[in-house]
Amino acid sequence: MLAAIALSAALQNAVQANKTPAAEIGVVRSGKLIVDDAYGMADLNRHVAATPQTQFEIGSVTKQFTAAAILQLKEKGELNLTDPLGKYVPEYTQGKDITLEQLLWQVSGVPNYTEVNHFQHIAGSTPGGVDPALALIAKKPLDFKPGTRFEYSNTNYILLGAVVARVSHTPWETYIRRNIFERAGMSHSGFIQDEPRLPDTATGYARAKNGKLQVAPPLHGPWAGAAGGIVSTVADMAKWDAAFFDGRVISAQDVALATTAHRLSSGKSTGYGFGWFVDKKAGQPEIAHSGGTFGFASENEYFPTLHEFVIVLTNVAALDAGFIADQTFDAINPQIAALENKPAKGEDPAITALARQWMHRMQTGDIDKSQLSSAFAKHLTPQMIGGMKQGLAPLGDPTSFVYRGKSKESGSTAYQYSVGFKGARLDLTIAIDGHGKISSLGIGSE
């Protein structure tokens, strides 16, 4: 009883520390949903409190469902993962030779339609769908030769949704509802375009540049579609996780395939399977995906050696869901969390000082491109710099900076750190090339 009270207090503190309007938090341990609690306000203006029945947009966690749909059709013999995209979506001529598995693995080179200029305005003011999404990138060449590198693109899964619809002769949403929601018992899930008819959908918020919350811009559901269009609850997401990993949605063999990180021809792991990232948190194997829309963020995390799931749904477009998931993991695994403050061996103080400097630069937007490789300097657009500042500045100064180790990546050495803040923890990766220039920076929740 006391442990449950302490856990509830820790979770409520996590939500309040991040100033999250509302969060629904779930913990599944050994097949039982032991935590399904809601905190905060689903609608600030109308003073509606969040409950376990409140529905949230899950964003890119939707990709797990789309990948499962493709694998179901593969199991029925209706498609092959090595089929070329042109067999199903011939109108996208640049991608005609890309295979379905390259889309699933995010190694296709297809440009990301959600990164075009003014996308937020477009997606809130015009009807969406596969055709409008493809129109945004129709004149763009592939970003790289398919199969040669990993680069996350929402377009990959919009295209896979089109494949599901055309092979099954039914809209993607209808297919997901009939073949996944109903099979898993997900009676409180739907799609963004259903929200006006759903009784308990939260209002989404975004943080303005001054940090204040404001109602998020509108999003026409089909713009998110198969890449991020599902609305759900923690209880339903727990049902999805159970059905998926128990082999009730796809075969056990395909579950293993979907949750195994792909390796490029170079042997380098991409850290991504079919709609699932494959990584570690606090030294524990983790199979997970995060999600975000204009006004929501989510985390769906599975720790196979611990037999635990952590599910977090929030109604703010920020890093809050990842922070809260970290704090939830720490609260239910205090002994493992204690190990997070022990640095790895072989730390280089000069590199750590550089990493600290660049954490501050990302928070302030003060980017010195002379320290970057030419390729990375070109890649780091003003929009990306502004986005980093907006997301990281509210965290304040780091309270801890722990070295986690290093690895070789494409001619560079990548150094990993766990960076603590008041109420949050992030992973920071800084890669240094052979000329001493920063070739990449990675930031995310642990």
Segments and roles (model prediction):
Residues 8-58, 78-83, 139, 214, ...:
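Short, conserved catalytic-motif segment at the N-terminal edge
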Residues 19-22, 294-297, 424-426:
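Short, small/polar residue-rich loop motifs at catalytic or cofactor-binding pockets
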Residues 43-44, 96-294:
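Short, surface-exposed loop or secondary-structure junction motifs
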Residues 81-95, 184:
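Short, glycine/proline-biased beta-turn/loop segments that scaffold the active-site neighborhood
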Residues 285, 314-383:
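Short, gly/Ser/Thr-rich active-site loops of penicillin-recognizing serine hydrolases
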Residues 289, 299-316, 428-429, 438-444:
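Short, well-ordered beta-strand elements
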Residues 366-410:
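Short solvent-exposed beta->alpha transition segments
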Residues 406-446:
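Exposed beta-sheet edge and beta->alpha loop/turn motif
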